[in-house]
Amino acid sequence: MFIDVGAASLFFDVVGESLNASTPDMSQRPTMILLHGGPGYDHSTLRPYFDRYSDTHQLVYLDHRGCGRSTGEQKTWYLDRWADDLAEFCRTLGINFPVVFGQSFGGMVAMHYAARYPSEVSKLILSSTAAQFRLDDTVKMMRELGGDYAAEIAHQFFSNPSQEAYDAYGEICLPLYSNPNASDAGNFRNRAIERP
């Protein structure tokens, strides 16, 4: 589904019911909004891990502005705008006091949202994220994990993004984030809609 927010069309998917039909009073389930990593990926990377919680929460998967199926011009890709998108999204759909889960980049958006709108979030769950991005630390990590070539690609990707840099980062650097012995290492790229 799509919703227009701040000159962008945001894609979202809902799993689970808002009202619990198995209770006599049709009690309201908490809504959990799930924010994917990236930028450049979509919510499908989270679905295999979180759909199972639809028996206790209504799950709302959101593709950030400019990511996945969502639109939005690159000049509007910044944390204030992504946080404001989430606030407007919740207000428009009547989602009050959501539990907000943020993975990696989604965690940065979640923290920014909670800082800008502290009275509008009930809980914040953060996974594999940081309060701020440090290019030098990321380049150092890529050098340690993948050598000088991986460090060079990471620097190019984060300092001068292009389709070529995005493709190289996806091929060389992204696998370094995974356990190479895992049976599904790197398979998330097969399901995700990737956009630089």
Task: Locate each region found by the language model.
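Catalytic nucleophile-loop/oxyanion-hole region of alpha/beta-hydrolase
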Residues: 71-83, 130
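Conserved HGGG/HGGXW glycine-rich cap/lid loop of the alpha/beta-hydrolase fold
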Residues: 6-75, 89
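Conserved acidic catalytic loop of the alpha/beta-hydrolase fold
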Residues: 80-98
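Short acidic-hydrophobic surface loop/beta-edge motif
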Residues: 1-5
